[in-house]
Amino acid sequence: MPTKICVTLDGGYVRALCKQSNKPPKDPRYIEKIAHACRTPEEVIHRIMFYDSGGFSGTAKQPVSGQTKQFTANDKWLHELSYKDLLSIRLGVLKFRGFVLNPARIPYTPGQPLTDTDFYPDFEQKGVDMRIGIDMANLSANRSVEVIALATNDTDCIPAMKHARRSGLQIALICFHGFRPAPELLAHTDFRRNIAWPT
């Protein structure tokens, strides 16, 4: 009998690594390829869980001019991703935290006035680790899978990982080529699963 697994992808983490590796971060077909690369030939995917937040839509006053800046989210790629086989999307919320001075302007040079372009918007993803934890607890309770293949670098997931292992499930931490996971995560993992970027 093949081993049933749930592939659990922290979207913010996966997209960040895609950008650093010159891979398409919001291509539904490529994300699907990544998910399938997380299983071994002896395993069958029960479900693919993709956790992310939609884009931010709203307005904010720019830090220098005081003019209003409009933010418009484009979440078409998430809708397309949701139609993929076996894939379920869990969305957190993206919060706007203000504008941050570009490090290139630090330290500030007198005589060079700052402009709005010297600042970039700062966003924070909320609720994703909580949703990962809830779903891992549900998988532990109903025992619908034997292995959770987890792609994240968020140490807030450790309590859920510990609970799943105590319940008899195995955790395979997905390690992408060229990137090192947090040591704390490895301490609560059954397997370190190294994968190459799909072509």
Where do the language-model regions lie?
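Domain-level signal for Mg2+-assisted phosphodiester chemistry and nucleotide/NA-binding surfaces
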Residues: M1-P107, D116-P121, Q170, F176
